[in-house]
Amino acid sequence: IQVVAFVQDGWVREPGTDKLMHEALELGADVVGGIPWIEYTDADMKQHVKEIFDLAVEFDKDVSMLVDDAGDAGLRTLELMAVEAIQRNWHGRALAHHARAMALYPMPYFQKVAALLKQANMTVVSDPHTGPLHARVKDLLAEGASVCLGQDDISDAYYPFGRNNMLEVA
């Protein structure tokens, strides 16, 4: 079991988040978590990603973020995360969840992002049971990117049938 210090309501749009995240990591949280796509602007999303990696480097922690989790092909937080992981030399220490917008990416952009994921040694966790859009698992595998399945929701509003059974997801 790992404890994730998670920015539930955004970094920029929720004042005081930085202090809460520091406190959680000082208390021993194992992973730094973010959700940059819920910020209001592209600049705020980029700052969110940067701040999460700043904490990861400061505390020597892995990163786990919910990215591009909406049906909007214009979302770019998965790319931002991969680039940041590469620039910080955080290879193999970053995990991206959902990436539902990937289902709508044009193929050239998808291939660009897949190459970045591979370079960053980043894994994408797809949760296909919680909505009609999901990460392009087969295409990611064909591009040589790392993918796994997850169960994000257990008996909640998003998926009230979740029972923490990975066979349901498979």
PLM segments and residue spans:
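His/Asp/Glu-enriched, well-ordered alpha-helical/loop segment
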Residues: 62, 83-94, 121, 137-170
